[in-house]
Amino acid sequence: MARYRHSRSRSRSRYRRRRRRRSRYRSRRRRYRGRRRXRSRRGRRRGYSRRRYSRRRRRRY
């Protein structure tokens, strides 16, 4: 029984990870569509340096 429970939790975590990745891409797309609204506190805390670098690079262009 314990073994089944463990495998079940493992598959659940895997599904959650895939879903999280999808939501991240979706949020990224939404930011481009609505830059003013999009700016969410959760996205800002996650990968803040990466966004800053991309912004600097875009400004140079």
Curated annotation (Swiss-Prot):
<keyword id="KW-0158">Chromosome</keyword>
<dbReference type="GO" id="GO:0035092">
    <property type="term" value="P:sperm DNA condensation"/>
</dbReference>
<keyword id="KW-0544">Nucleosome core</keyword>
<comment type="function">
    <text>Protamines substitute for histones in the chromatin of sperm during the haploid phase of spermatogenesis. They compact sperm DNA into a highly condensed, stable and inactive complex.</text>
</comment>
<feature type="region of interest" description="Disordered">
    <location>
        <begin position="1"/>
        <end position="61"/>
    </location>
</feature>
<keyword id="KW-0238">DNA-binding</keyword>
<keyword id="KW-0744">Spermatogenesis</keyword>
<dbReference type="GO" id="GO:0000786">
    <property type="term" value="C:nucleosome"/>
</dbReference>
<dbReference type="InterPro" id="IPR000221">
    <property type="entry name" value="Protamine_P1"/>
</dbReference>
<keyword id="KW-0221">Differentiation</keyword>
<keyword id="KW-0217">Developmental protein</keyword>
<dbReference type="GO" id="GO:0030261">
    <property type="term" value="P:chromosome condensation"/>
</dbReference>
<comment type="similarity">
    <text>Belongs to the protamine P1 family.</text>
</comment>
<dbReference type="GO" id="GO:0003677">
    <property type="term" value="F:DNA binding"/>
</dbReference>
<protein>
    <recommendedName>
        <fullName>Sperm protamine P1</fullName>
    </recommendedName>
</protein>
<keyword id="KW-0539">Nucleus</keyword>
<keyword id="KW-0226">DNA condensation</keyword>
<dbReference type="GO" id="GO:0005634">
    <property type="term" value="C:nucleus"/>
</dbReference>
